[in-house]
Every structure is written in C-alpha cells, then in structure tokens.
C-alpha cells in the first residue's frame, strides 16, 4: 500500500513516488480510479505512468496483465493532466531507448528512429551520415566511430515556434555501445554499456516533449551517435584528431570517447548562437564515486548550473552542483 500523508505535509515528489508505488503494486485489478480534485495532478499522473513502466519489447513470454488508472479531477485540470501525460510519456521514450540492446540500436537505426519520432512531433530533422561527417570536418565523431562496422551519424532536431524569444541548444552523448575501443574496458559489466547513449535519449525526449507541449522557446538538439569498437581502423592512443571548427586534440585513452564526440557536437551547436547550451552525458564513473548512482553532477556557469540543479530536484531528478575549475 502507498503511504498517506496530510495534505499540508505532501510535496510533489512524495505524491509522485506514492503514485509510482501504487502503479507497481496494484497488478491484480483491471481498473482503478483516483479522485484528486485540483490537487497533485501533475505528480500523480507522472508517478502512475513512470512507476508502471516496464521494458517488454523483447520478452518472449506473453505480456503481463495491465491495470487502467482513471484520474478524477476538476474539469479545469484537463490541460495540466495532458501536459503531465506528455512529459511522462516522453520520459518513456528515453527509457525504451536506453533499454534497447546494441545489436538493434546502433547509429543508423537510432537515427532512423529519432527521425520518425521527431517528424511525428513536428520537428525539423537533419541527419549526417559518415560521408557528410567526413566532408564537414566532424573529426571527433569519425575518430570514435571508425573502429566499428556500423558508421556514425549526427542527428539534429529543431523546434522553431513562431515568436520564440529564446533559443536553447541541447547536446547529448549517443555512444550506442562502448567497449572502450583500443583502450579496452574490463569485461565485467560491459553489458551495461548499451546505456552509454542515455544523454542523447534524454535530449531527444526533451525536445519531442517540447514540441508536443507547443513550448514557445526555440530548441535545437545536436546528437552525435557512434559505436566505440576496437576494429582494424580504430583510433589509437596517441593519435591526433581535428575537431569540427579546427581545434585538434591528442587521444591518450580511447575510452574517453565521449569528450571527442561532444567536442564536435558542442562546436556545431554553438554556431546557432543559443541563449543557453545544456549538455548531458554518461561521461565517467568517477561521478558515481562522488555522488552515487542516482544523483547527477551539474557543472557550468555558476548561476545557470545552480538553477539547473534546483530544477532537477524540483521534478524528482536528483542533481547536485559540482565545481568546474580551470587550472
């Protein structure tokens, strides 16, 4: 059973978690109705959808029984309900992508999926294949992807509402599988590297949600997609590569591939002169040593960094401001 609190003691995260617990616990009933009035619509709807999530796309057994939840509320809450539903269902897009194995989700298929989802949401889509990446000078993305039989892609999704006064650039790391390349990772738990594209999935889901919500802010998502493999043409430790924009870098460890693809993507995103640039990535296990597995480290311009961490906590995404020092 879910915990129950007095109304004045309940915050959004408590409601969200209680609704999620209910969605996971109530499995033997075909339908459930809950009455909220005008209270807690957003966190309850989000909790029910997110808490009831299961990745079942590849299971061989028959699907589990489902429960239908009906939220009874004031008629005036319809818009809030719809917004919460769109937001939560967009999160499920990211979850499904992260859970999809790399033999099915690789740069080409990932780009095709994003293109279809984005077009359905009314976004503009641009996909650069390996020939276009080479021609336009995306040396970081090419350096990471050249060891794989599955060539890299760069996906650009754009939301351009009329009269938008702000433009936000989103960048997300999209390494569909990371062996470490020539600097090979240990075998233990390497299977978890199917999720090394989580940053790009989050950013793709965010811009899709923005389009469906008709947000009045311009957004562009720049998503570098590559598979980091130790093939015969793979980048070697000691190689020097030229990034998009002309800056060079020396590769000392090919398992630092995220920085290479993101350098290209951030340089390209910066050409749009955004008011804000937000990048998210599964960059290093050292972050988990610092903050654990459930808290994201946020680095950047101090005021914006602190606001981003605060917003994350407000919506149930644990985040903590971290220093970004120059030495």
Predicted features along the sequence, with ranges:
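Short amphipathic alpha-helical segment within the helicase RecA-like ATPase core
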Residues: 2-174
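A generic structural signal for tightly packed, nonpolar segments enriched in small/aliphatic residues
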Residues: 111-327
């Amino acid at each position: 059973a879910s915990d129950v609190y007095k109304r004045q003691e309940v915050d959004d995260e408590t409601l969200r978690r209680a609704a999620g617990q209910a969605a996971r616990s109530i499995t033997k009933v075909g339908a459930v109705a809950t009455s909220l009035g005008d209270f807690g619509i957003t966190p309850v709807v989000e909790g029910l959808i997110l808490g009831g999530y299961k990745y079942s796309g590849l299971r061989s057994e028959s699907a589990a029984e489902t429960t239908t939840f009906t939220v009874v509320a004031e008629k005036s809450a319809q818009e809030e309900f719809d917004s919460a539903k769109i937001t939560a269902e967009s999160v499920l897009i990211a979850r499904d992508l992260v859970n999809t194995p790399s033999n099915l989700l690789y740069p080409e298929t990932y780009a095709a999926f994003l293109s279809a989802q984005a077009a359905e949401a009314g976004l503009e889509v641009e996909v650069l294949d390996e020939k276009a990446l080479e021609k336009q000078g995306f040396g970081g993305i090419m350096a990471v992807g050249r060891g794989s039989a599955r060539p890299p892609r760069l996906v650009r999704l754009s939301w351009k509402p009329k009269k938008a006064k702000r433009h936000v650039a989103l960048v997300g790391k999209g390494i569909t599988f990371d062996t470490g390349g020539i600097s090979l990772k240990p075998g233990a738990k390497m299977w978890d590297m199917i999720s090394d594209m989580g940053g790009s999935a989050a950013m793709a889901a965010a811009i899709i949600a923005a389009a469906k919500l008709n947000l009045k802010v311009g957004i562009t998502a720049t998503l570098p997609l590559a598979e980091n493999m130790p093939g015969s043409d793979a980048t070697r430790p000691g190689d020097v590569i030229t990034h998009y924009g002309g800056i060079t870098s020396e590769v000392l460890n090919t398992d630092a591939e995220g920085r290479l693809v993101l350098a290209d993507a951030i340089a390209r995103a910066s050409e749009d002169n955004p008011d804000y640039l937000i990048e998210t990535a599964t960059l290093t296990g050292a972050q988990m040593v610092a903050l654990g597995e459930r808290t994201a480290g946020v680095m950047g311009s101090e005021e914006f960094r602190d606001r981003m961490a605060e917003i994350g906590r407000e919506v149930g995404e644990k985040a903590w401001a971290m220093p970004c020092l120059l030495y």
